[in-house]
Amino acid sequence: QEQHSQLEAAKTQVEKDMGEKISNLERELENANDLLCSTKRKGVMLSEEELTAMSPTAAAVAKVVKPGMKLTELYNAYVETQDKLLMEKQENKRITKYLDEIVKEVEAKSPILKRQREEYERMQKTVASLSAKLEQAMREIQRMQDETDKANKCSSVLERENQRLELQIKDLSQQIRVLLMELEEARGNFVQRDDVSSANISSSSEVITQHLVTYRNIEELQQQNQRLLVALRELGEAKEREEQESTSSRVSELEKELENALSELQQLREARSHQMTLVESIVRQRDMYRILLSQTTGVVLPAQDETALTSTPRKSPGVSLDGSTSTPAAVVVSDSTEAAEARAALKQLQEVFENYRKEKAENDRMLNEQHDKLQEQVTELRSQNTKISTQLEFASKRYEMLQDNVEGYRREITALQEKTQKLSATTQKQEQIINTLTHDLRAANEKLAVAEVRAENLKREKELLKMSEVRLTQERESLVAEQRGQNLLLTNLQTIQVTLERSETEIKQRYNNQIEKLEQELAQTKKKLEHEIEQRHLLGKNQDVQVLELKKQYEMELNLHNNTKELLKNSHKEISVLKQQLNSFELQLASRSSQQAANRDKDVNIEDVEEIKTKLRQSEELVNDLKERLKTATSNVEQYRSVVLNLEESLNKEKQVTEEVRKTIEVRLKESSEYQSQLEKKMMESEKEKQELRDEKHKTVEQMEQQVTQLRQSLSSLQAEVQQALQRATTSASNEQKAKQDCQEQARIAAEAQNKYERELMLHAADVEALQAAKKQLTSASAIRHKCEETAQKAGSQLLESRASWEERERMLKEEVSQIQSRCKDLEKQNGLLHEQIESLSKKMVTSVQEGALNMSFGEEGKSQEQVMEILRFVRREKEIAEARFEVAQVECLRYRQRIEHMERELHELQDSLNAEREKVQVTAKTMAQHEELMKKTETMNVLIESNKILREENEKQEQELQQLQAKIRKLESNILPLQESNAELSEKSGMLQAEKKLLEEDVRRWRARTQHLLSQQKDTDAEEYKKLLSEREVNTKRIQQLTEETGKLKTEVARTNASLNTCQSQLQSVKDDLTKIKAEKEKLQKELDAKILDIQEKIKTITQVKKIGRRYKTQYEELKVTHDKMVAEASSAKADQLQEQASQKEVQELKDSLQRSEAKVTTMQTTVDNMQKTLDDKDNEIKEHQEQISRMQAELSHLHKDLQDKTAQEEQMRQQINEKEEKTKKTLLVVRQKLAQNNGAKEQLTRENEDLKQKNANLEQQKEELEVRMSALRSQYDGRISRLERELREQQERHHEQRDEPQETTRIPQQRQITLQPTTAAGERGSANTSEPPTANIKPTPSKVTTAAVPVNKSTPRASIRPMVTPAAVSTPTSTPTATVMPTTQVDQQEVQSEGQMEHVPVFGSASGSVRSTSPNVQSSLPQPILTLQQQTQTTAFVQPTQQSHATIESPTQETPVEIVQSSPVERPTTSSTFGTYSATPSSSIPKRPREEEEDSTIETPEQIADDTDQQRTKKRKEEDIEEKTETEAVINTEDALHILTQCSNMEFPLEEEIVESPIQTSQVIESQAPEQLQNVQSTQDSLQDTPPKKTHNLVIVISDEENEDEQEGYEEEEQEDEEEDEDDAGIGEGDDSNEETGSADGNEDYEGDDAEEADGTDPDTETEDSMTAGEGNQRAADSQNIGDSGVVTAESTFSQETREQPSSASDRQGPRPPQSPRRQAHPPRLTILAPPQELGPPPAQRIPVARRQSVGRGLQLTPGVGGMQHFFDEEDRTVPSTPTLVVPHRTDGFAEAIHSPQVAGVPRFRFGPPEDMPQASSSHSDLGQLASQGGLGMYDTPLFLAHEEESGGRSVPTTPLQVAAPVSVFAENPAADTSDHASQSVPMVTTSTGNVPTSVDSGAADEGDEVFVEAESEGIGAESTLEMDTQQEEPVQPSEADLPSTSQDPPSSSIADTSSSKPKPRRVWLQPQPGGRPFKRSRGGSDFRGRGGINRSNI
C-alpha cells in the first residue's frame, strides 16, 4: 500500500510539473503572436513611450536625430559643431593667455597676500581657540546653573511642604488637646486650661493657631469654617491686587527701557551718518590732492593701488625736453619777466599757505574724529560692563535658586524620617504576624508529618497501579496500530483506483488540447508565410527609394567637396597675402628699429613697433586658426567620401540580402508542407499507443484488486488477535481490584495495630512483651522473605533466558524486515526511473512536436517511436519481476508474524507468573514496614514535643532582639536630626556670604560706572594713568575672580554637607534593608527547622535500635535530659552576658557625635545582625555540641571589643574633620572681609587717580593755549620767508648765467652725481645709471647690534637716496602746527660756493638730509641757557660718523615722517649741537664711550664747556662748507624750471614729520684719523670760507664725500634692489592705501621692532653692507635728485607742537619687512656741517618736555610734525630738492592724509647722500644721546621726532609731546651707559636715546626758563622697562647693545658683535615709553606684541 501511495504521489507531482510547463509554453506562444502582430505594423512609427520601453538609448537618439534627417545632414551638423568647438578652443586659448597674465600679476603680489593670509589664519586660529574655550566655559556654567536650579526647586518645594505639614501637625495637636479637654470636662473631671494672653501674640500665624484652629463642638467648627472662608477670600483679593500692580509696574519699566534703547539707537545712527560725511570729505580731499599733484608735476596718478606702488611721479619726457629747450631762452629774459615770475611764485606760496590752512583745519577735524572713535570705544566698554554685571546678577539669582533647592532637600529629609517611623511601625506589625504564622506553621508541620506517612503509602500503591497501566496501554497501542495499518491499506487501494481513472481522463484531454494547438500553429505559420512574402515586396520598394536618395546625397556631397576646395584655395591665397604683409611688416620693423637706434628719444616709433608686433601676433594667431580650420575641412571632405563609399557598399549588400531572403522563404515553404504531413502520421501513431496504454491499465487494476482481497484476510486475523488481548486486559483489571482490596484490609489491620501499640506504650509493662512478639514476627517474616527472594531470583533467571531468546528472534525478524524494506526501496527507485523516463518521453514528444514544426525528418521520428516501444517493453518486464518478488515477500511476512504471536504468548505467561511472585513478596514487605513505621511514629512524637519547646524559647529571644534593633534605629533617627540642623546653619552661612558677595558686586558696579564717567570726562588721559587704571582694573578683576572662587568653594562645602546627608539617608536605608534581611533569615531558620525535624525523624530510627536494649534506653534518656537542661541553662546565661555587653555598647555609642553616630550605629546594627545569624547557627548546633557554642560566644565577644575600639577611633577622626571644616569656614569669612577692605582701598585709589587725571587735563588745556600762541609766531615767520624767496630768485637767475660759462662742469657733475628716482615697482640691476627715470629712496631705521671699542674703524656710509614724499600733517588737537622755513643765504655765499665743483651737493634734510644729526645733544642740566639774538649766533658744525641708528619710531596712523631739520627760530628751539660717540664694532668691548665732541650753538656763551678739538673741527667745517657751497652752486642749475622749483624749495616749509634718515656720526678725532683726504679738501677751501662772512647764519648741511662715479652706480643698484624688496614690504602694510608714498607723523615714539627690527643686525666691521635708509618702505633711493638749489644753505625751522602728544597711533602696530643686505664698497664717511639758524622768535612761556618712563631701549627723539608749505608744487625734477625730499604718497583713506610737499628744482644736478666708494664701512657705532635724559635739559631734537619711519614698514608714527629747550645748548654727554647709535648706512641723521642709567636730576635753571625736561627715572621705567626684549641680548642691561637699536637702514646690516659676521636677520623687540601724550607700541613681525607698562594695542586706542 505504501508503495502504491508513493507511486500515486509521484504521479501527481509529474502531472503538476507537466501542467506548469504547458502553461509556460502557452505564454511564450502568446508573446510570439504579439511580436508577430507588431512586426506586421512595421510600416507604422512607434510612439516615444514604446521606444523608451524598448530601449532608452534609442529614444534619446530619436529625440536628437529627427526621422527625416539623412546621414549627410547628420554629418553636416557634426562638422558645424566641430567648427564651433575650434572657435571655442581658440577663445579658450585667448582667455588662458589673459588668465596667465593675471596670474603673473597675482604671483607678484603673492608674498603680500601670503603674509596677510598667514596673519589672518593665525588670528582665526586664536579666535577659534578662544571661542571654543568660551563655549566650553559657557556650557559648564549652563550645566551648573541647571543643576543648581533643579536643586533649588526641589529644596523649595520640600521646605514649603515641611512648613505646611508642621503647621498642620501643630493645629491638629491643638485641636486634639481642646477636644480632649472637652471630653474630660464632659466626663466631669476638672481640667486646667492654658491662658493665652493677647499681649504674647507676635504674628498672624499665632493668631490663626489660637483662634481659628481649635473648636469645642460642631457649632464652633462651623463658625471657624466661615471665618476661614472669609479670610481666604480677602487674601485672594489682596493677592490679585498685588499681582496687577506688579505687572503694571513691570510693563512701565520695560517701556522706559525700550525708549532708552531706541534713543541710543538713534544716536548711533546719527554718529554713523556723521562718520560717513567725514569719509566723503576725506575722499574729496584725496581727489583734490591728486588734482593738485597732476597740476604741479604733470603726473597723473593712477588709482590707489597703483599709486601705492610708485614712489615718485614719473618724469614725463615732454617736460624734460621743454626744460632743456627753455634753459637757453631764460638767458635773454629781462628783469621784468623775473619780477613776474617772482610774483607768480609769491602767488603760489600764498596758495600753498592757504592749502596749509585747509590742511590744518582738516587735521583738527581728524583729531575730532579720533576723539569720537575713542568715545565709541568707551561706549562699547560700557556695554561690555553692563553685560558682565547682568551675568553677575544672573549668577546671584541662580545661587538663590540653589538655596531654595537646598531647603526643598531638607523637607525631603523630614519626609523620609517620617517614612522611616512608619516603616518601623509596620515592621512591628509584621513581627506579630510572623509570630502567629510560626504557631500556624508548627500546627501545619504536625499535620504534614501525618499526611506524609499517608502519602508514602499511597505513592507505593500508585506506582503499582502505574506499572499495570503501562502494561495495558502498551497492549492497547499494539492493537490500535494493527487496526490503523488495515485501514490505511483499504484507503490506499481506493485512492489508487480513483487516481487511475482520473489520469485516464486527463491524458485524453491533454491529447485533444495538443491536437487543437498544433492545428492553430499550422494556421499561424501559413499566415506568417503570407506576411513575409508581403514584407519582401515592401522591402524591395523601400530599398529602391533609398538607392535614389543615396544618389542625391552623393551629388550633394560632391558639391560640398568642391566648395571646400574653393575655400581651401582662398585660404591659401589669404595666407600668402598675410605672409607678404608679414614680410613687409618685418622690413618696416627693421627700418624702424634702425631709426630707433638713431633716435632713441622718439617714443612714437616704439609704440608703432609694439602695435605692429601686436598685429603680427594677431595675424599669426589668425594663420594658425585658418590652418586648423583647413585641417578640419580636409578631414571632413575625406569623411564625406568615406560615407558615400560606405553607402554604396551597403546598397549592394542589401540587394544581395533580399535575393537570399527570397530563396530561403521558398525553401521554408517546402519544408513546412513536408513537416505537416509528418505531424499527421505522428498523430495516428500516438492514438495507437494510447489504446495499448489503456489495456495495460486494465491489467494493473485487476492485479491490485487481488492484492486488496489478500490484505482483507490478514486484517480479519489481526482483529481476532486484538479481541484476545482485550480479554487479557479485563482479567488483569480484576486482579488489580483484588490486590487493592487486600491492601485496604492490610491498612485496616495496621491502623488497629497502631492503636493497640499506643495503648501498650501508655503501659510500660506491656512494652517489653510487645517487643518480644515483634521480634518473633520479624524472624518469621525474614524467613518468609528469604524464601520469596529465592523464588524471585529463579523467576528472574527464567525471565532473562526467555528475554534473550525473544531478543534473538526479534533481531532475526528485524533483519528480514530491513531486507524487505531495501527491496521496496529498489522497487521505488525503479518506479521513479520509470516515471522519469515517461517524463523525458513526454518532454521529447513536446520538443519533437515543436521541432517538427521547424525542421524534422520522418526517419528520426520513426527511430524515436521504436525507442519508446523498447522502453515500454523493458518496463513491463521489470514490473513482472517486481510483482513476483512482492508475492514472495508477503509469504515470508505471514510466517514471521505467526512466530512473533507465539513468542508473545510465551512472554505473557512468564510475566503473569512473575507478577504473582512479586505480589506475594510485596505483601510480606508491607506488613513489616507498617510495623516498623508504628514504632518510629511513637518515638518521633516524643522528640517533636521537646523540639517545639526549644523552638518557642528561641523565637521569644529573637523577638526581644528585634525590639532592641528597632530601638537602635529610633536612636539613629534622633542622631540624624542634629546633622540636619547643622546643615541648615551651613546653608544660612552660605546665604550670608552670598549677600556679602552681592554687596561687593554692587560696589564694583558703582566703581565701574564712576570710572567710566571719569573716562568719558577725560578725553585723553595720560598713558601712565591709563596704564595704572588698567593694572588696577586687572587687580580688581583678579580679586573678583578670587571671591567667585571662594563662593564656589563654599558651594562645594554645601554640596559636601548635602552629600553627607545623603550618605546618612543611604545608611538608614541600609538599616532597613538589614531588617528585611533579618526577616528573610528568620524565614530561612524556619525552613532549617523543618529540615531538622526531618533529621530528627531519621534519628528516631537510631532510637528504635536503642529501644531494643530496653530499660537501659530509659535511664540513658533521663541522663541525657538532665545534661540537656544544664546545657540550656548555660546557653541562656551566655545570652544574658551578651545582652549586658550590647547595653554597654549602646552607652558608648550615645557618646558619639552627630555624623559619626549614624555611621557607627549602622555598622553596629550590621554586626548585631551578623551576631544574630551566628547565634541562630549556634543554637542549631547546640543540640549536638554545647561546649563549642560557649567557645564561639567568647570569640564573638572579643571581636565586639575590637569593633568598639575601632569605632571610637573613627569617632575621634570624624570630630577632627568637623573641627577642620569649621576652621575652614572661619578662614573663608576672614578672607572675604579682607577682600572687602582691599576693595575699599582700591576705591580710594581710583578716586585719587581720577583727581590726578583731571589735573593733567587742565595742564593739557594750558599747553593747547601755548601752542596757539606759537601759531601766531609762525605766521610772522612766513612773511619773512616770502621776502627771502624773492632774493633767492634773483640769485638763481644770476647763477644760471654763470653756469653757462661753465658748461663742462655742469655736464660732468650730473653724470657723476645723478641718481634717478625710479618707481618702487622697478627692479633694475646695478649700473642702470642712464635710465630716464630717477629712483626713489625708501629710508627706514633698522636696529643694529652695537659693540663699542676704543679703536675707531672706517666704515662706508651707505647712501640714502630719498624720494620726494608727501607727508600729511599729524592729526593733532587744534593747536598751532609748527612749520619749517628755508632760510636763504646771501648772493655772495652762493657765488663763492659755486667756485668749487668737486664737493658733493648736500641738502639740508629732514628725512633726506645727508649726514646731519637731527637729534639734539645731551644737554647738561646745570646750564640754563638764555635765548640770544640773531647776532650772537655762530656757525656750528656737526661731524657725523656713519653709524647704525637704532630708534623706535612711532608713526601716526596716516603719516610717515620726513623730518626737516631746518633751524631758524627759537620757537622750535632746535639745538644743532649733537653729541657724537664713536664706537668701532670690535667684538672685544661693548661699553659705549662718551662722545668727545659737542657742537656749540651760537646762542650759548659757555666757552669753557667746549674743548679745543671742537673749535678746530668747526673752523675746518666752515671752510668745507663754503667750498661745498661753491661747488654745488656751480654744478646745480640747468634750466628755468630748476629756477622755478628752487624758489619753491627755498621757501619750502620742511615738514618735521618727514622721514628721518640716519646720519653717520663720528667724533672729530675719528674723522681726522679716518678721512685725511677730506680734511685736505677742507683746508684747501678754508680761505674762501673765511673770506665770505655770512650775513645770516643758517643751518647748512654739507656732505664732503670722495665718492663720485662709483657712488652713482651703487645708488642705482641699491635702488633697484630696494624697489624689488619694497613691493614685498608693501604687503606688510595693514591697509591697502598705506604705500611707499605715505608719510607718518614724525612725532611718533613708536616701538620700531616688527619686521624691520627683526631683520636688522649689527654689521661686522669686515663685512661691507649696504644699509638702507630710514622710512618704513624699505626702499632706499639716492636722494641726489634733491638739490639744495644754489644756496646749498637751508635753515630748518622746526616748532614742536604738543598736539601730537594726544595723538594715538592707530597703525603703530604695522611694520613692513626690510630687504636683505647687499654688500657695499668701503668708503670714507662724508662730513657735514650744520650752520645754526637765526632765532627769530622767543620761546613760548611754559613749554614742557616730560620724558616720562624712558626705557633703556635706544629711543629716537621726536620732532613734532612741521607742516610744510609749498607742498603741491613739485615738478618732474622734484628729486633735486635743496632741503627735504618730497615723497609722493597716495592719500590715506583713514583720514590722516594731509600732505606736506617739498619743492622741486628742475635742471639742478642731483646730489647724492652717501659716502664715497673708497671709504671703509662703519658697521655700527653709538651716539650718546641717551645721556640727554640724564642731563635734564633737552634740545629740540630730543623729542622722538626722528624715530618715525616710512609707512611701508607697516608702522605709523604716533606723535608724542615734543621737547623744547630755551636755547640750543651743546653739552658733553656725561653718562657713558646711555647711548644712541646711528646706522652706518645713512647720511641722514636719526637719533635714539637709550637711558640705561637715567638720573632724575633736572636743571633748575632750565626749569626757570620754562624749558625744563622731565625725566621720570622710576624704578619701573629703568629697571623693568629698560630691559630690552630681543632674541640675542649679548650686552649688559645698562649698556644696550646695538641689537636693541633700530637702524635707519632698510637692509639689515651684518652683526657687529663678536663672532657674528653673518647677516641673518634677528627678531628684536624694542620697548618704547612714549611721552605723556603718546602711546607706546612694540613692533614685531606679523603682529603686535605689547609688554611692559603701558603697552597698548592699537585696537584698544
Swiss-Prot record:
Q: Residues annotated as region Disordered?
A: 672-706, 1290-1352, 1438-1529, 1561-1752, 1795-1832, 1870-1997
Q: What spans are recorded as compositionally biased (Acidic residues)?
A: 1601-1637, 1644-1667, 1902-1915
Q: Which InterPro entries match?
A: TPR/MLP1 (IPR012929)
Q: Name one Pfam family in it.
A: TPR_MLP1_2
Residue stretches of biased makeup (Basic and acidic residues): 672-702, 1290-1305, 1511-1529
Q: Which GO terms describe its cellular component?
A: chromosome, centromeric region; cytoplasm; cytoplasmic dynein complex; mitotic spindle; nuclear inclusion body; nuclear membrane; nuclear periphery; nuclear pore
Q: How does it assemble?
A: Homodimer. Part of the nuclear pore complex (NPC). Interacts with nuclear receptor KPNB1; the interaction occurs in a RanGTP-dependent manner. Associates with the Importin alpha/Importin beta receptor.
Coiled-coil intervals:
1-36, 101-277, 335-1103, 1129-1305
Q: What protein is this chain from?
A: Nucleoprotein TPR
Task: Cite the record's Polar residues compositional bias ranges.
Answer: 1306-1321, 1328-1347, 1446-1487, 1561-1587, 1692-1709, 1817-1830, 1879-1899
Membrane topology, as annotated, equals: Peripheral membrane protein
Q: Which GO BP terms apply?
A: cell division; cellular response to heat; mitotic spindle assembly checkpoint signaling; mRNA export from nucleus; mRNA export from nucleus in response to heat stress; negative regulation of RNA export from nucleus; negative regulation of transcription by RNA polymerase II; negative regulation of translational initiation
Which family does the similarity line name? Belongs to the TPR family.
Tissue specificity of this protein: Expressed in epithelial cells, oocytes and egg (at protein level).
What are the alphabetically sorted keywords of the record? Cell cycle, Cell division, Centromere, Chromosome, Coiled coil, Cytoplasm, Cytoskeleton, Kinetochore, Membrane, Mitosis, mRNA transport, Nuclear pore complex, Nucleus, Protein transport, Translocation, Transport
State the organism named in the record. Xenopus laevis (African clawed frog)
Task: Give the superkingdom in one word.
Answer: Eukaryota
Compartment(s) of residence: Nucleus; Nucleus membrane; Nucleus envelope; Nucleus, Nuclear pore complex
Q: Could you tell me the gene encoding this protein?
A: tpr
Task: Point to the regions of Low complexity compositional bias.
Answer: 1950-1959
Q: Briefly state the protein's biological role.
A: Component of the nuclear pore complex (NPC), a complex required for the trafficking across the nuclear envelope. Functions as a scaffolding element in the nuclear phase of the NPC essential for normal nucleocytoplasmic transport of proteins and mRNAs, plays a role in the establishment of nuclear-peripheral chromatin compartmentalization in interphase, and in the mitotic spindle checkpoint signaling during mitosis. Involved in the quality control and retention of unspliced mRNAs in the nucleus. Implicated in nuclear export of mRNAs transcribed from heat shock gene promoters.
Q: Which GO terms describe its molecular function?
A: chromatin binding; heat shock protein binding; mitogen-activated protein kinase binding; mRNA binding; protein homodimerization activity; structural constituent of nuclear pore
